[in-house]
Amino acid sequence: MKPFSKLCDAADWSDPLFDRVIRVELAEEPRFHRKQWEFARILRTLEAHGLLNGTSHGLSMGGGDERLLYSVARRVGHLTVTDLYGAGSAWEGARTDDPDRAIKASAPFHVDSSRLTAMRMDMRSLEFGNGVFDFCYSSCAMEHIGEYEDFLAHLREVRRVLKDQGVYVLTTEFHYGDEVIPAPHNYYFSASFLDGLVAAAGFEARGGVDGALSPHVFNRPIPANLRDLLPDAADAVTGRLLDSTPHVQLLTGGRPFTSLCLVLTKAAHGASAGIRPIADLEASREFIDEGVRRWKAFVERSPLNLDPFVAECGHTRGVPRLVAASESSPLFHTGYVWLGGVTRAVTIDFDAWPAAGSGAEAELRVHRHPDLRPDEVACAGSIRVPIHARERLRRQLQIDADDRCSYAVLARVTRGACWIDDMRVQVTIP
């Protein structure tokens, strides 16, 4: 029998049991998206362990108002839902000062509200007694809570509040490489890091992890920020097509990752803890690496049109924008994209004119960061552009792209204030 802990695999959507969970328990149409996979995998695992029995008591952590919690709540005795709820939360699903009322009011289908309680709580410090829950679960939440000591504190707290035979089902970000990627507020975990972390917390993934991937085209990695490469992503047709694009194996920069489901139980005294073995992982890495090479070859020979306003969510396209000199407010800012390892020409093309007749100046820049250290941002090139009157400006920077890094194009006003309109950013082969 294969272990319940496993990597996200496009072939999972062909499993009739998995399909039933999506259609019946989640009440959704199947789509190749790893978030749906996470929800369905957690449900399927809890079901297979006999924990969706109408009497069990469970704990959800970091779930906001996710659909999954309602699917679980209607099949257990009681589900306690926790998150860092608050009106100022950066997460839309957790943006409430009255989580119990808000969560119960947000149910996408009928759920007996007496089976559900929501409260604000830090998953590193669970305010419950010892051994009170039959199961706990979290869906891609742990990677957001900090660093190693935070992850360890969380797992130890879960171990404490679980009954001796309890199960913790979690999904998280899995990097196929040997390194951990400590992105701000979002870690991508390696196999060895998770193995050591789980062992240190006194947990084991009984039977190891199924690391096999089917040779399916939807298992070829694509950029997680694919929308950043499409300036017209807000267009109805483009947006609809993007919503149908597989979101299974992904790239952050040039680094491949996916979702991993771990099914953890308390390690017996003297038993080997951790998540090993991970069956067929090396074969899966070879398949994924071939997909990365294919994407790299495509990117290196293709012109790329970048969305200039990824970092400016409040900007309305087609409306002129007034920006004053500021260190913190960019004129525009693309997302960080992987360009492979060849020389690239970056062309910025836009209408600009000074505000109130005064002169202005803008600085156009290309920034980069190593994919393994996304917090280490450096300037890869810049040019200053004086703005004296209304005109169409076209400037070009040339960079030697490093395939270990990702790049963003941005600008800021360095003097005065100016209007901009019809901004276009293109990356080509010079």
Give residue ranges: language-model regions.
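Conserved class I S-adenosyl-L-methionine
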Residues: 52-64
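Extra-cytoplasmic beta-strand recognition segments
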Residues: 334-362, 393-397, 401, 407-411, ...
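Short carbohydrate-recognition loop motifs
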Residues: 309-330
